[in-house]
Regions:
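Long, internal low-complexity/basic segments
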Residues: 75-90, 94-99, 111, 122, ...
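Short glycine/proline-rich turn/loop motifs
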Residues: 95-107, 151-156, 241-245, 343-348
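Metal-dependent active-site segment of extracytoplasmic phospho-/sulfohydrolases and closely related
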Residues: 168-206
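Active-site His/acidic residue clusters
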Residues: 39, 45-48, 122-164, 200-202, ...
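Anion-binding catalytic surfaces of enzymes that hydrolyze or transfer phosphate/sulfate esters
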Residues: 77-151
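Loop/turn elements at helix/coil->beta-strand transitions in domains of secreted/extracellular proteins
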Residues: 24-27, 129-136, 185-191, 235-236, ...
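C-terminal cap/loop subdomain of S1 sulfatases and analogous C-terminal strand-loop tails that border
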Residues: 7-37, 51-52, 199-231, 245-338, ...
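Catalytic-site neighborhoods of secreted/periplasmic enzymes
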Residues: 1-104
Length: 378
């Protein structure tokens, strides 16, 4: 329902916007063109920008200014939220973004209303499709930057605006579940809640997120965070609910979101061609709680690659910076490579590469073979 199908360069925002989700099989979409900190700050419904006045056409550029819109770099006095790094171009709703935009004023979203807008659309979709099979991809903006929760959530977390945005996200998820319950659909509806990466606190705005953590450690016992090849960047929350099929419980099975394709193909009796989803494995028994094991191995990526096999993890040698200074995140780069046993050392603090030279060599060989083949599924 709210995804990010286009990146800088984009289409003509004043005409039919194609290709998009409909061209790859969706019947309907209500989406954000990019992340909330990028222009254009509008919604797209199917092929058109919502609420666009044709007399006020949209222009977008990520290379140079367009129109006469003020920027955060030149007019910081107009900002209600200042950037900490980047995010200093066109100002929309008192917040400077990545990229330049002009026009489309009637179509621009209101940041504090985004959760309500997207969730209302998702609830309507469920109501309209209650009597037939459906697939809903519901991607919230929260807790991505800029963090501007609705006033009814402000101050509710005790951990500043980032915590409040997470409370708002929790409300969004709750509305979806409550709707399924109200429509008497939960027993035959598989719901997955997950994230695209690990946490980040300062991701481009001086919003007080760092100062208001109040002892909370978003990454928990893990090392790194968003942008990192350490587990704090690549290991993400994953909750599956299917009351009619899956019993409540916990699992340590190794699975990846890419595995959804092969797993749900198996669930629905479909066959994947060899060239389709070349890195997707069928881990349906693990997802359904019928097996405690998932895939045998996993390639992780964040600039450099890592190889997970059971609890053991090889991070290949990397020449990049060890710290992303803008976000204060350990990246995982090390010129000699790293090897960890995650059962004994979940925080990846004890590099065992020197003591496991043969295993490191074997894992690196397998990683290189997959890189050269361009696929990991046989």
């Amino acid at each position: 329902m709210a995804s990010r199908p286009w990146q800088p360069g984009g289409p003509d925002w004043n005409a039919d916007i194609k290709p998009g989700p409909i061209e790859i099989g969706f019947d309907y979409n209500f989406i954000m063109p990019a992340t909330g900190d990028r222009v254009p700050c509008v919604y797209v419904e199917n092929h058109r920008v919502v609420g666009l006045d044709p007399k006020d056409p949209i222009q977008v550029s990520f290379a140079q200014p367009v129109g006469a819109e003020p920027t955060g770099k030149d007019h910081p006095e107009l900002l209600r939220m200042h950037p900490s790094h980047g995010h200093d171009q066109t100002i929309v709703n008192g917040i400077s973004r990545i990229g330049y935009m002009s026009g489309g004023k009637a179509a621009r979203w209101v940041d504090q209303d985004m959760a309500d807008t997207i969730t209302t659309k998702a609830v309507a979709f469920l109501e309209q499709n209650r009597n037939k099979p459906f697939f809903l991809y519901f991607a919230t903006h929260d807790p991505h930057v800029p963090r501007v929760p609705h006033p009814r959530f402000v101050g509710k977390s005790g951990c500043g605006v980032r915590g409040d945005a997470i409370v708002e996200f929790d409300w969004c998820a709750g509305e979806i579940l409550k709707t399924l319950d109200r429509l008497k659909l939960p027993d035959n509806t598989l719901v997955i809640l997950s994230s695209d990466n690990g946490p980040v606190v300062d991701d481009g705005y001086r919003d007080g997120a760092v100062e208001n953590l109040n002892g909370h450690r978003p990454v928990g016992p893990l090392r790194g965070g968003k942008y990192s090849v350490f587990e704090g960047g690549t290991r993400v929350p994953f909750i599956l609910r299917w009351p009619g099929r899956v019993k409540p419980g916990l699992s340590d099975a190794l699975v990846c979101q890419i595995d959804f394709l092969a797993s749900f193909a198996a669930l629905t009796g479909q066959t994947l061609a060899t060239q389709d989803a070349p890195d997707s494995f069928n881990v349906l028994p693990a997802l359904l709680g019928e097996s405690k094991t998932g895939r045998e191995h996993l390639v992780e990526q964040a600039g450099i690659l890592a190889w997970r096999q059971g609890p053991r993890k090889l991070i290949e040698a990397g020449k990049g910076p060890r710290i992303n200074k803008a976000t204060n995140t350990e990246m995982g780069n090390n010129p000699t490579g790293q090897f960890y046993n995650l059962t004994l050392d979940l925080g990846e603090t004890n590099n065992l590469a020197a003591q496991n030279a043969e295993t490191v060599k074997s894992y690196q060989s397998r990683l290189n073979a997959i890189r050269n083949a361009g696929r990991s599924r046989p």
